[in-house]
Amino acid sequence: MTEELYLKDSYIKEFEGRVVRIEGNYVILDKTAFYPGGGGLDNDTGFLVNEKGERISVTEVKRGENGEILHKIDQNGSLNVNEKVIGTIDWDRRYRMMRLHTASHIVAALAYRKFGALITGGHISPEQAKDDFNVENKDTLIELINEANEIIKKDIELKIYFLPREEALMIPAIVKLAGRNPPQIPIWRIVEIPGIDIQADGGPHVKNTKEIGEIVLLKVENKGKGRKRVYYTVKP
């Protein structure tokens, strides 16, 4: 299993690792700060530097069948099993997604608290987030974005910690995605925005809501009866 450094610290930009296995263009390391994507969030990109000092681009990161994290590399350099590497993530890309990710938790929490609305689908890229909600009224989503921006200004420190599954399941509304079953893993990573939201979540987040900046509504689409899709980004 690959040690996932981002689970404890989303702000690791560079790390040292060792090549455990190579499968074609994919490299498995003993540890990584690259997020493999998941939960609607895009994967990280960046590069590895081998022992010769060659810079090798990482163009895709994904989770393998055995829980290992696979780093897809280009052919501008060579790697060998047991070779030490230095990994660097594309921080600008990652940090924008962190801001959008935390913003999406605030929006989802407000939707659930005010209207009992659940997310029925979503995706976060560096450019924007899109979420599907089971709500009837477009104005509801505009209201949520405005209220989320007021919460962001409150300068709230996030808490990230780990709980046994049985203990985590006792937290009300720990899963806010419609149709999503609680994960079967024994230890859950909990992301809490005190007074606002608490969720089981495996992705990178900012430390403080003020880092989000401002949520900017891009558009709202009808996606069938009682379902709306909202697109938004963050600035600056």
Curated annotation (Swiss-Prot):
Listed GO MF terms: alanine-tRNA ligase activity; aminoacyl-tRNA deacylase activity; ATP binding; metal ion binding; nucleic acid binding
Residues the entry annotates as binding Zn(2+): 101, 105, 205
Biological processes per GO annotation: alanyl-tRNA aminoacylation
Family statement drawn from the similarity comment of this UniProt entry: Belongs to the class-II aminoacyl-tRNA synthetase family. Editing domain AlaX-M subfamily.
Magnesium among keywords: no
Cellular component GO terms, alphabetical: cytoplasm
Protein keywords: Cytoplasm, Metal-binding, Zinc
Role description: Functions in trans to edit the amino acid moiety from incorrectly charged Ser-tRNA(Ala).
Coiled coil regions in record: none
Record carries keyword Cytoplasm: yes
Localization (cell): Cytoplasm
PANTHER family: ALANYL-TRNA EDITING PROTEIN, ALANYL-TRNA EDITING PROTEIN AARSD1
Protein name: Alanyl-tRNA editing protein AlaX-M
Cofactor note: Binds 1 zinc ion per subunit.
Requisite cofactors: Zn(2+)
